[in-house]
Swiss-Prot record:
HAMAP family attached to this UniProt entry: Ribosomal_uS7_B (MF_00480_B)
Record's function text: One of the primary rRNA binding proteins, it binds directly to 16S rRNA where it nucleates assembly of the head domain of the 30S subunit.
GO MF entry, a single one: structural constituent of ribosome
The organism's place on the tree of life at top rank: Eukaryota
Record note on quaternary structure: Part of the 30S ribosomal subunit.
Protein's UniProt keywords contain ATP-binding: no
Cross-referenced Pfam families: Ribosomal_S7 (PF00177)
Location in the cell: Plastid, Chloroplast
Family: Belongs to the universal ribosomal protein uS7 family.
GO BP: any one term: translation
Protein name: Small ribosomal subunit protein uS7cz/uS7cy
Record CDD domains: uS7_Chloroplast
Key words of the record: Chloroplast, Plastid, Ribonucleoprotein, Ribosomal protein, RNA-binding, rRNA-binding
Amino acid sequence: MSRRGTTEEKTAKSDPIYRNRLVNMLVNRILKHGKKSLAYQIIYRAVKKIQQKTETNPLSVLRQAIHGVTPDIAVKARRVGGSTHQVPIEIGSTQGKALAIRWLLWASRKRPGRNMAFKLSSELVDAAKGSGDAIRKKEETHRMAEANRAFAHFR
């Protein structure tokens, strides 16, 4: 048994302009090769494009998109007696948001388009409306969990 104490859970910091934790989480996920200023640039351009497209508060669109993509349940591979089962597990809110952000960025990178800011803004607007690849990914995950409901007792 470890004598070391448990670590305190780190809370996500908020970004300098919008004072929003979700924006900062997005920036940290979009970050590549330590280029944080470029990541901020991409996010802020995407937010401006959302403002132009929807003519509503872009942060509410972002919140709505992340809320729409956040999964409640996922499947985890579990090996039981020589065979691997996909076991459905519930997901906490923090992990769900992290997954949602990862899926949104994956879907926006896959999109055809000019630049990342344009693709990200389009994906966020679509996700807020309830369509797009990220929403499809969430629904697919929920379907997988529902199909493997029989293995829920393997948790």
